[in-house]
């Protein structure tokens, strides 16, 4: 009898909703993240936040700063700091390419979302982004309102 294949879908754990509003996304890249077991359990329960988090590059390593992971309530062995720096896993060539773009153009690395892949590993989608000015944010809001208005008109007919 054939063995049933177990298929896991990509489950989106957490998302940084403000990132697309406050930044102009130029390029995205997916990276692995180095976590401890209790942190993975917390993320699976949805007790994590990417708000106000960003990535930095130090000594050819990428670090995710200010990612909030609430400590797992059943872990009594070690108390971890909720906003500690976490290492992101990328190839050296990718890190050097990102470093050069950040240095020459004044761009920022921000996380857009974190999700579990088909193997159950947590991945972080990073974006190479440029901060929006206030008038750019207003244009985004106007465009969204116009789109909503058009949708309402289409529903009426």
Swiss-Prot record:
Main location (coarse class): cytoplasm
Cellular compartments per GO CC: cytosol
Pfam families membership: SmpB
Entry-linked InterPro entries: SmpB (IPR023620), SsrA-bd_prot (IPR000037), SsrA-bd_prot_CS (IPR020081)
Gene Ontology molecular function terms on file: RNA binding
GO BP: trans-translation
CDD domains, sorted: SmpB (cd09294)
Coiled coil spans: none
Localization in the cell: Cytoplasm
Keywords assigned: Cytoplasm, RNA-binding
Classification via PANTHER family: SSRA-BINDING PROTEIN, TMRNA-BINDING COMPONENT OF TRANS-TRANSLATION TAGGING COMPLEX
Family: Belongs to the SmpB family.
NCBIfam families attached to this UniProt entry: PRK05422.1, smpB
Purpose of the protein: Required for rescue of stalled ribosomes mediated by trans-translation. Binds to transfer-messenger RNA (tmRNA), required for stable association of tmRNA with ribosomes. tmRNA and SmpB together mimic tRNA shape, replacing the anticodon stem-loop with SmpB. tmRNA is encoded by the ssrA gene; the 2 termini fold to resemble tRNA(Ala) and it encodes a 'tag peptide', a short internal open reading frame. During trans-translation Ala-aminoacylated tmRNA acts like a tRNA, entering the A-site of stalled ribosomes, displacing the stalled mRNA.
Protein name per UniProt: SsrA-binding protein
């Amino acid at each position: 009898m054939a063995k049933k294949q177990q298929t896991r879908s990509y489950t989106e754990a957490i998302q940084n909703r403000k990132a697309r509003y406050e930044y102009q996304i130029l390029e995205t890249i997916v990276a692995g993240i180095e976590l401890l077991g209790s942190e993975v359990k917390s993320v699976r329960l949805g007790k994590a936040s990417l708000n106000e988090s960003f990535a930095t590059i130090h000594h050819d390593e990428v670090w995710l700063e200010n990612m909030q992971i609430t400590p797992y309530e059943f872990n009594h062995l070690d108390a971890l700091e909720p906003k500690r720096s976490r290492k992101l896993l990328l190839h050296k060539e990718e890190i050097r390419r990102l470093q050069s773009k950040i240095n020459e153009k004044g761009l920022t690395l921000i996380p857009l979302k974190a999700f579990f892949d088909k193997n159950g590993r947590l991945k972080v989608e990073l974006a190479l982004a440029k901060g929006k000015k206030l008038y750019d944010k207003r244009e985004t809001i106007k465009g969204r309102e116009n789109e909503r208005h058009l949708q309402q008109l289409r529903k009426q007919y």
